[in-house]
From Swiss-Prot:
Organism: Arabidopsis thaliana (Mouse-ear cress)
Membrane-spanning parts: 80-100, 103-123, 172-192
UniProt entry tagged with the keyword Hydrolase: no
Domain named Reticulon: residues: 70-244
Chief location of this protein within or outside the cell: endoplasmic reticulum
Pfam families reported in the protein's UniProt record: Reticulon
GO CC annotation terms, alphabetical: endoplasmic reticulum membrane
Cited InterPro entries: Reticulon, Reticulon-like
Keyword field: Endoplasmic reticulum, Membrane, Transmembrane, Transmembrane helix
Gene of this entry: RTNLB7
Name of the protein in question: Reticulon-like protein B7
Cellular compartments annotated: Endoplasmic reticulum membrane
Keyword Chaperone: no
Amino acid sequence: MEEEKLEIVGPLEEPLMGNIVPEEINGLDSLTSSDSDSEKPDSPVPINAPIYRMFGRERPIHMVLGGGKPADVLLWRDKKVTLGLLSAVTVIWLLFGFGGRRLLTSLCRGSILFLLLSFLWSNALNKSPENMMDIYIPEKPLLQAASAMTFELNCAFATLRSIALERDIKNFVMAVIGLWLVSVIGNWFSFLSLLYICFVLIHTVPMLYEKYEDEIDPIAEKAVIEMKKHYQVFEAKFLSKIPH
């Protein structure tokens, strides 16, 4: 009897286990598939969305300005040097711009004062010339400034030459309008005042832009879009009618 029971029970257990196990596996598969489906986002979200930066730059403003000491001065990282430069240039502008002083006259009078002080130092006070402070202009910064100015002037001349020779009426008209606007601005200020304004802007605008670039860039993007729209309208109405 026991053998018969074993023979009967044995075949019955296999289909029971076979029916139970696949259902459990199917249940687990459905759970995992539903979990994976729920974990999938509904729509792809860009991780690294492009951020508009003025002039299409991809580097920090400090690196755009060349880095090093000049960039530190322009961005007010070295406040003592920046304030010293602005103060000195402001004094020079006030003396020669509003004070009515002449550069040659001031240089000659300064040289006379230097000669008098040197004479008193060496003769009346019986001081040796070796104890006097040497005054000289360093050569390297002047050469760098002259080289940079020469490069910019050559680029400007090359640009004007290419505009004059490429026979593109649109570029020619735009260049003439730009130069005319600069000449109008030049009538409002003297050359020394223009240099002073440019110097102050160079030493203030980069610092303010670096400080508030997250607020300035969206406004600049909207302004660029509007300017492009107005330029397209201007080109369609006027520039497109100019023969090539």
